[in-house]
């Protein structure tokens, strides 16, 4: 998105926009008079906004539409609450359609092209940088099918903020940009942000000790052994750890991985120049240290003696060619949105040149796996055998059954006061179990040592049972309702805004998720506290979401 970035003067203009003041925003108190239809009359500020939008779009209520969800009990209950709320206004006649996960994703990607009349209940997992929560979903360049802007939402100011946030490197200025961006999104409401999710981990307390909960789901199994983060897990009288995956592993190759489960499965196989630890701090991994040489150039010193699982020894050439390998792939934007070139100084020193100043540079490196030259040259297919430098190496994948790794005894880590030189767990077996209830039953039978994202209603029981350990922390995920901005009446901001005000967030959190998570009004997770603290959330809610 380099061509859409704004210059310094424009960024300053964006930063100077006062917080919680938006020119042209539809204010709740600003509606005068009462528009009416034969079939519906507005009751309260939210419905007045909807009524205004219906009149502008020349839509006679009730408007028939569908809430599209995946086949999931919790999602179905959310949809039922939303259906009841919208139908209760008499402006909508809503039905619910559930689809298997694959069909749901396909319909989202094609919705705008087919002008599908549907509201999508979905979720998103961000990361350690605020751009992860907004760019793919709301930048006009990222409209489906090539991006994930499902509603084909367009807002020039939103685009400017997203681009400015990426090029800004001053931390305070980035906070202001992303807060203003979130304000703009809530005011325009291309989506309703409903709940910040929690990372919830449950383990057999008689077997697993010292488990730590990583807040982002792709890193669920870093707790097994992540010496770069100062973390490891031991087992009581066992050497095989048995966990689970919520679906099958579809891709092994880093340049093809586009799903959370594939990332979970390969997280201990591949490594990057740096890692982001359990507290969000950037830590050395394959790089021992680095320095910024100028605004767009960084020099990295590589760890010596690092061996790939196929016997290759890590050099700067591996790093340069691993970056180049992303070009022309489905993960190209992970690198080539900011990467310009690399210069090899010597075998263990490399300079990385960015196209422009890039705010999330260090966290972006955590997305770029370093792979062996055999894979880059085509002698090795990582889709058949994933090979990296990680503490565990691939053993087998029995599709629909399990994924298995074994300890890599030639891993580079030599031990320190916090983490032993050798991972205590020899074998990791991840059973592929798609149903939440089946995963819970397997854990209770003792077939699993660990599971994640179990039904919310069950967590309280596990927390009361001394036989289990439970880890809960706010994650990088949020639940949302995506509106078809390409289709009247949802093309009208006032309709979307009115619907956003009506979402029964507290009831959803309490009745569906049993208080697991937090009510959300904005997209950026409280995991990034500076960008989404509680007081900021409340200011946004009071100004734009709460009807009174």
List PLM regions with ranges.
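Surface-exposed binding/hinge segments that line
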Residues: 291, 335-376, 385-398
């Amino acid at each position: 998105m380099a061509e859409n970035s704004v210059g310094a003067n424009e960024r300053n203009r964006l930063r100077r926009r006062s917080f919680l003041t938006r020119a042209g925003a539809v204010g709740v108190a600003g509606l005068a008079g009462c528009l009416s239809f034969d079939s519906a009359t507005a009751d309260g500020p939210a419905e007045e906004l909807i009524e205004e939008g219906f009149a502008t779009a020349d839509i006679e209520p009730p408007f028939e539409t569908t809430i599209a969800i995946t086949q999931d009990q919790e999602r179905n209950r959310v949809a039922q609450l939303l259906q009841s709320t919208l139908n209760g206004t008499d402006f909508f006649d809503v039905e619910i359609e559930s689809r298997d996960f694959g069909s749901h994703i396909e319909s989202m990607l094609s919705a705008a092209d087919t002008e599908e009349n549907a509201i999508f209940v979905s979720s998103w997992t961000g990361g350690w940088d605020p751009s992860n929560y907004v760019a793919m979903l709301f930048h006009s360049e990222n409209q489906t099918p090539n991006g994930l802007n499902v509603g084909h939402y367009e807002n020039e100011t939103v685009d400017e903020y997203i681009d400015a946030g990426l090029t800004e490197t001053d931390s305070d200025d980035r906070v202001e940009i992303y807060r203003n961006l979130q304000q703009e999104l809530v005011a325009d409401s291309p989506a309703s942000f409903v709940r910040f999710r929690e990372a919830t981990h449950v383990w057999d307390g008689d077997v697993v000790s010292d488990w730590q909960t990583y807040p982002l789901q792709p890193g669920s199994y870093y707790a097994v052994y992540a010496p770069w983060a100062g973390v490891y897990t031991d087992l009581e009288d066992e050497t095989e750890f048995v966990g689970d995956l919520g679906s099958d592993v579809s891709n092994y190759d880093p340049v093809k991985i586009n799903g959370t489960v594939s990332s979970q499965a390969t997280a201990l196989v591949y490594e990057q120049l740096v890692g982001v630890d359990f507290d969000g701090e950037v830590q050395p991994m394959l790089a021992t240290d680095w320095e910024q040489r100028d605004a767009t150039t960084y020099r990295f010193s590589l760890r010596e003696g690092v061996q790939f699982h196929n016997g290759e020894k890590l050099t700067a050439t591996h790093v340069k060619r691993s970056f180049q390998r992303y070009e022309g792939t489905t993960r190209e934007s992970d690198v080539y949105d900011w990467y310009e070139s690399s210069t090899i100084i010597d075998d263990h020193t490399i300079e990385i040149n960015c196209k422009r100043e890039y705010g999330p540079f260090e966290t972006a490196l955590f997305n770029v796996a370093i792979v062996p030259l055999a894979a880059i040259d085509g002698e090795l297919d990582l889709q058949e055998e994933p090979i990296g430098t990680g503490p565990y190496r691939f053993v087998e994948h029995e599709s629909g059954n399990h994924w298995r790794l074994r300890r890599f005894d030639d891993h580079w880590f030599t031990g320190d006061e916090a983490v032993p030189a050798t991972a205590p767990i020899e074998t990791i077996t991840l059973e592929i179990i798609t149903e939440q209830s089946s995963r819970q039953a397997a854990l209770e039978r003792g077939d699993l040592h660990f599971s994640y994202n179990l039904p919310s209603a069950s967590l309280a029981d596990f927390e009361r049972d001394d036989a289990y350990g439970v880890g809960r922390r706010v994650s990088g995920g949020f639940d949302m309702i995506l509106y078809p901005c390409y289709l009247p009446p949802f093309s009208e901001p006032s309709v979307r805004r009115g619907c956003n005000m009506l979402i029964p967030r507290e009831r959803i959190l309490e009745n569906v998720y049993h208080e697991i998570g937090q009510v959300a009004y904005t997209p950026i997770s409280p995991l990034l506290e500076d960008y989404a603290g509680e007081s900021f959330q409340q200011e946004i809610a009071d100004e734009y979401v709460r009807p009174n």
